[in-house]
């Protein structure tokens, strides 16, 4: 038994209706790296052999009686791999457009809460003979950094690693209501002990937020009590999604970063802002003010994590979609990102995780339902959700099949119906765009806007580069 922390539990509480809080993980395999090629029975066997390497795959959640504490993870004695691993063929010709349309259908369904909260679709028929593993993994299990650890456990470092031998598994029966109630009462003192320090941290945060709010300059970060400017992405969720993805050369992103003296994350945020600006211009409503993005920030380093979970928090950053000039936009983005880092360092002891850890389940669930009823008017996640996760630098393998590409994105929410996430993998900078189908009819337009913004910055960087820099 392991109890969910506050953020883990929040991800469950936010579920419901058309809000799906599962994340999307896509690994595209190249079977040509195996002399025997692709085999569905072999893939099924690998999942069977490797399930024990990811203990979360066998964990289901159980609520705490009377809502006295957050839910718990327990091993599922009825775990059935075939209920989680499915097989499907991508419509011809198996290009990225057909694949992404299939992913939209796969994603837009809630996971079965009576089972472990994940599902993998093995998608055959991609162009070039490739195969994709499309995994829905509930955000309650892990944040992006934790998923990196899962990747390291599930995939090989080399194609020649010895087969994994699964040990015997005998899960205990599900705990009774009485047991779960006893565990909640046992854990209650430690929970109560966190109240005083958290209240002090919240009080300090309120003071800091007020100091930030006194200055309307965009060099200070947006705060929770500041409403984001209204836009087309701030609406309630429908049941359908739109999805697109594309790989960019990581070397080009690094070139822009190095030459223009900013971080890779600055480049990413500036390109997101450029993409949103182009999209809104085509919609006839160009932004006249800075927008606000919700951005996850790491709290606990990977080395200090005892088990998978959500150890990250979130803060807000100005998205400078109001600036037309790409270099001015990048400079303003750099200042905004630095301000957000400083703000988070001062307020992280009173972040969403610390507060949610103490609030009763029924209160949080009630607030989540109210946010859904009002179509996200609580303005919790502002205009856009963005994330940039540095992934593996070396290729990974499933058996002898090389992982050719890796894509990942988080969920969207009532009031924040657009998510743009990038994961780097080897020499790739892999972008996903996930949106509500009513809020954004065509995510390929946003992806194209990101590409155009990247090309603008790359051209500007190369125009400024010295001959020595261009040679390297």
From Swiss-Prot:
Annotated source species: Mycobacterium tuberculosis (strain ATCC 25618 / H37Rv)
A GO BP entry: symbiont-mediated perturbation of host innate immune response
Known role: Required for maintaining the appropriate mycolic acid composition and permeability of the envelope on its exposure to acidic pH. Upon expression in E.coli functions weakly as a triacylglycerol synthase, making triacylglycerol (TG) from diolein and long-chain fatty acyl-CoA. Has no wax synthase activity.
EC number: 2.3.1.20
SUPFAM superfamilies found in the cross-reference section: CoA-dependent acyltransferases
Stated family: Belongs to the long-chain O-acyltransferase family.
Domain of life: Bacteria
Main enzyme class: transferase
UniProt xrefs under InterPro entries: Acyl_transf_WS/DGAT (IPR014292), CAT-like_dom_sf (IPR023213), O-acyltransferase_WSD1-like (IPR045034), O-acyltransferase_WSD1_C (IPR009721), O-acyltransferase_WSD1_N (IPR004255)
Annotated Gene Ontology cellular component terms: plasma membrane
One Gene Ontology term of the molecular function aspect: O-acyltransferase activity
Reactions the enzyme catalyzes: an acyl-CoA + a 1,2-diacyl-sn-glycerol = a triacyl-sn-glycerol + CoA; di-(9Z)-octadecenoylglycerol + (9Z)-octadecenoyl-CoA = 1,2,3-tri-(9Z-octadecenoyl)-glycerol + CoA
Residues at the catalytic site: 139
Protein name per Swiss-Prot or TrEMBL: Putative diacyglycerol O-acyltransferase Rv3087
UniProt cross-references to NCBIfam families, sorted A to Z: acyl_WS_DGAT
């Amino acid at each position: 038994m392991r109890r969910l922390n506050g953020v883990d539990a929040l991800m469950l509480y936010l579920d419901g209706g058309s809000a799906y809080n599962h994340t999307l993980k896509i690994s595209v395999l190249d079977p040509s790296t195996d002399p025997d090629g692709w085999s569905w029975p072999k893939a099924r066997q690998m999942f069977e052999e490797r399930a024990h390497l990811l203990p979360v795959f066998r964990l289901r959640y159980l609520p705490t009686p009377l809502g006295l504490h957050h839910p718990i993870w327990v091993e599922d004695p009825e775990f059935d791999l075939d209920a989680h691993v499915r097989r499907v063929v991508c419509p011809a010709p198996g290009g990225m457009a057909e694949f992404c349309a299939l992913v939209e259908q796969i994603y837009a369904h809630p996971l079965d809460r009576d089972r472990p909260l994940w599902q993998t679709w093995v998608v055959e028929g991609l162009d070039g003979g490739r195969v994709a593993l499309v995994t829905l993994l509930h955000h309650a299990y892990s944040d992006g950094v934790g998923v990196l650890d899962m990747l390291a456990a599930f995939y090989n470092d080399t194609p020649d690693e010895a087969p994994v031998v699964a040990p015997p598994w005998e899960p205990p029966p599900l705990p009774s209501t009485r047991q779960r109630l006893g565990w909640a009462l046992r854990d209650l003192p430690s929970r109560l002990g966190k109240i005083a320090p958290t209240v002090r941290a919240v009080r300090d945060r309120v003071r800091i937020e007020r100091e930030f709010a006194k200055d309307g300059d965009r060099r200070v970060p947006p705060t929770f009590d500041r409403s984001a400017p209204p836009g087309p992405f701030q609406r309630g969720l429908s049941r359908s999604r739109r999805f697109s993805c594309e790989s960019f050369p990581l070397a080009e992103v690094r070139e822009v970063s190095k030459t223009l003296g900013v971080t890779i994350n600055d480049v990413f945020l500036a390109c997101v802002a450029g993409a949103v600006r182009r999209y809104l211009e085509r919609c006839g409503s160009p932004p006249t003010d800075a927008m606000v993005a919700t951005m996850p920030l790491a709290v606990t380093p990977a080395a200090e994590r005892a088990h998978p979970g959500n150890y990250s928090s979130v803060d807000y950053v100005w998205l400078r979609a109001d600036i037309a000039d790409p270099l001015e936009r990048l400079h303003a983005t750099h200042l905004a990102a630095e301000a957000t880092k400083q703000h988070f360092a001062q307020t992280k002891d009173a972040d969403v995780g610390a507060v949610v850890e103490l609030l009763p389940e029924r209160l949080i669930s009630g607030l989540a339902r109210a946010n859904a009823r009002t179509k996200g008017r609580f303005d919790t996640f502002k205009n856009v959700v963005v994330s940039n996760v540095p992934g593996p630098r070396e290729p990974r393998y499933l058996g002898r099949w090389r992982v050719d590409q890796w894509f990942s994105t988080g969920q969207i929410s009532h009031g924040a119906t657009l998510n743009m996430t990038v994961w780097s993998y080897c020499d790739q900078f892999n972008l996903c765009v996930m949106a509500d189908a009513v809020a954004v009819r065509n995510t390929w337009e946003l992806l194209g806007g990101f590409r155009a913004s990247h090309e603008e910055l790359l051209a500007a960087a190369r125009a400024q580069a010295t001959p020595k820099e261009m040679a390297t």
